From Swiss-Prot:
The gene is argS. The keyword Secreted does not apply. This is Arginine--tRNA ligase. It comes from Borrelia turicatae (strain 91E135). SMART domains: Arg_tRNA_synt_N, DALR_1. InterPro entries: aa-tRNA-synth_I_CS (IPR001412), Arg-tRNA-ligase (IPR001278), Arg-tRNA-synth_N (IPR005148), Arg-tRNA-synth_N_sf (IPR036695), ArgRS_core (IPR035684), DALR_anticod-bd (IPR008909), Rossmann-like_a/b/a_fold (IPR014729), tRNAsynth_Ia_anticodon-bd (IPR009080). Keywords: Aminoacyl-tRNA synthetase, ATP-binding, Cytoplasm, Ligase, Nucleotide-binding, Protein biosynthesis. It is an enzyme of class 6 (ligase). One of its GO terms (biological process) is arginyl-tRNA aminoacylation. Belongs to the class-I aminoacyl-tRNA synthetase family. Monomer. The keyword Oxidoreductase does not apply.
Length: 584
């Protein structure tokens, strides 16, 4: 709604400025209209900077403002304040329009078309099959899932992709440890999820390697056997990968993370080699004296000199590929399959240099333009005791974290719910809300120190707090339904409380927040918005009697406002992959 009003004002102001420029014989290349919220609400709802136009048109601000007011008409209340023109909306009409729009559009409220028809691929998660998902993976997963939903809400045609890394030396490490220490155990025999069992052997290998100098040679021998297709080795590889992937998929299901396409690296890693050989034929890369195929990539420098380059190997002298080569094959595969306009990689900040190089080479080899590829880098998730290290077992496993948080809430939940299954479901939903919100609320590029107690807080900027406000509003609406008050046309003119107006303005900005989150590729924008709305409603609820059986008209209006708040909060929760609960 606010977007529509701003667009209307922009069109009318632009028209006025163009007409004035024509009269002044001034040519304008671009009209930049700056709108913002006034510092105080009593000054208006929007403030428009006029001073810049005064300089360009060589006219006083009062003359320009007078002409703009003529163009705007009586639809808005206007007031000149120095270099600004302040706009006040017609509150009665605005409140009615917003509440009706939200309650009619329901889950579609906030959806827009700024990315209409844009084909977007987003690759995220991309786990290794040598360990279970940990809290760092959870941050990757929730960023990818949430951003996908935000991009879809803005009209994008989004395809979610997961590339599972199921080959290489790190996989061979678990295979070697299983051969030495496994004793033919299985997930069923060990009473463990497959990914957790595999993770145990990854840790065992690293313990073994500390005291055995030949461990690395054993890994290389095992890798060679796998590459040669040795039957026994491939059979073991398939078995362990199957256990790991089944376990990882269970965690995806638990956390409500989904993908449109899952690739296995073992099935596509050879494609990149052909791309390099074709590039060599076309003269896009070159062969070094030792037989390695290389390309020159620019070196970042602060010197004011000609661009410097360094050599980058794409195929080793023995014909084997590097990770970058395999990634080039992945880009081509997806370009052919989906013909994307943009591909986003959600990968940690430690890979920034890799992706800069990858995107440059992909462009030079003619696979796709560099600006069609995006590395959405995110900060690491650290523990109070320091950085996580999977090889040492120093991690918070995703499954264990969810279980731990669920158990922490069960004592309180059991006081309110006698049914064991209901209690467990509520506890799980609270823990997921806590984790997803906590991992999204910090700006993506920043590192996080995960704090379990803070994530579970019901009184602060947290997922459980948002869930609680949603459940509280649902309780209000249930009480309203029980009263069965005589229904009639709702009189929204009764909503004259300043807190009500503040809430309405926040609701009306929802679409703008989604657009900004999509353009910035930043789900934390929606997190901050959801907290702002929930906090505003909580303050309103504390100070205001929403249901008053002695005043049915006002009750109808206030409960309809509450419905609009709840719907908007639910829409936020969907974008953030936070479970909504009617009761907590």
């Amino acid at each position: 709604m606010i977007s529509k009003i701003k667009k209307d004002l922009e069109n009318k102001i632009s028209k006025t400025i163009k007409e004035l420029a024509l009269k002044q014989n001034i040519t304008l290349d671009k009209i930049n209209i700056i709108m913002k919220k006034p510092p105080k609400s009593e000054l208006g709802d929007l403030s428009i900077l006029i001073f810049e136009f005064s300089k360009i048109l060589k006219l006083s601000t009062s003359v320009i403002i007078e002409e703009i007011i003529k163009q705007i008409g009586k639809k808005y209340t206007t007031k000149s304040m120095g270099a600004y023109l302040n706009i006040k909306f017609n509150r009665k009409e605005y409140i009615k329009d917003i509440i009706k729009k939200v309650n009619e559009q329901k889950e579609k409220y906030g959806i827009n078309n700024v990315l209409k028809n844009k084909r977007i691929i987003i690759e995220f998660s991309s786990p290794n099959t040598n360990k279970p998902l940990h809290v760092g993976h959870l941050r990757n997963d929730i960023i990818g899932e949430s951003l996908s939903r935000i991009l879809k809400a803005s009209g994008g045609q989004v395809t979610k992709i997961n590339l599972i890394n199921d080959r290489g030396t790190h996989i061979c490490k678990t295979m070697l440890a299983y051969k030495k220490f496994g004793n033919n155990t299985t997930p069923e025999l060990s009473l463990k999820k497959g990914d957790h069992l595999i993770g145990d052997f990854y840790v065992k290998y690293n313990e073994y390697a500390k005291n055995n100098k030949m461990a690395e040679d054993e890994i290389q021998q095992l890798l060679c056997k796998w590459e040669e297709g040795d039957e026994e080795t491939v059979k073991l590889w398939k078995k362990l990968n199957k256990w790991a992937i089944e376990g990882i998929k269970e965690t995806y299901k638990l956390t409500n993370i989904t993908f449109d396409k899952i690739y296995l690296e073992s099935e596509i890693f050879k494609i990149g080699r052909e791309i390099i050989l074709q590039g060599l034929e076309k003269g896009l890369c070159y062969k070094r004296e030792d037989g390695a195929i290389c390309i020159n990539i620019p070196i970042e420098t602060n010197e004011m000199t000609d661009q410097k380059f360094k050599q980058k190997v794409l195929l080793r002298a023995n014909g084997t590929s590097i990770y970058l080569t395999q990634d080039l094959g992945n880009i081509l595969t997806r370009k052919n399959e989906f013909d994307f306009d943009e591909m986003i990689y959600v990968v940690g900040s430690e890979q920034i240099h890799h992706f800069k190089t990858l995107f440059y080479v992909a462009d030079k080899l003619g696979i796709t333009k560099e600006n069609n590829l995006v590395h959405l880098s995110y900060g690491m998730v650290n523990l109070p005791t320091g950085k996580m290290k999977s090889r040492e077992g120093h991690v918070i496993d995703a499954d264990n974290l969810i279980h731990d948080l669920s158990e922490s809430t069960m004592i309180e939940i059991k006081k309110r719910h006698s049914n064991e299954q209901d209690s467990k479901k509520i506890a799980l939903n609270i823990s997921l809300g806590a984790i997803h919100y906590y991992l999204l609320k910090t700006a993506i590029h920043k590192d996080i120190l995960f704090n379990k107690e803070e994530s579970l807080s019901f009184t602060g900027n947290s997922g459980p707090y948002i869930q609680y406000v949603g459940a509280r509003i649902n309780s209000i609406l249930d009480k309203y339904d029980e009263l069965n008050l005589p229904s009639k046309n709702i009189n929204f003119d009764l909503l004259i409380n300043e807190n009500e107006w503040a809430i309405i303005k926040i609701i009306s900005e929802f679409e703008e927040y989604i657009i900004k989150a999509a353009k910035d590729r930043n789900p934390s924008i929606i997190v901050n918005y959801s907290y702002l709305l929930a906090k505003s409603f909580s303050a309103y609820y504390q100070d205001t009697k929403i249901i008053d059986k002695d005043n049915p008209e006002l009750t109808h209006a206030r409960t309809d406002l509450s419905k609009a708040v709840l719907q908007t909060i639910k829409n936020c929760m969907h974008l953030l992959n936070i479970p909504y609960m009617k009761k907590m």
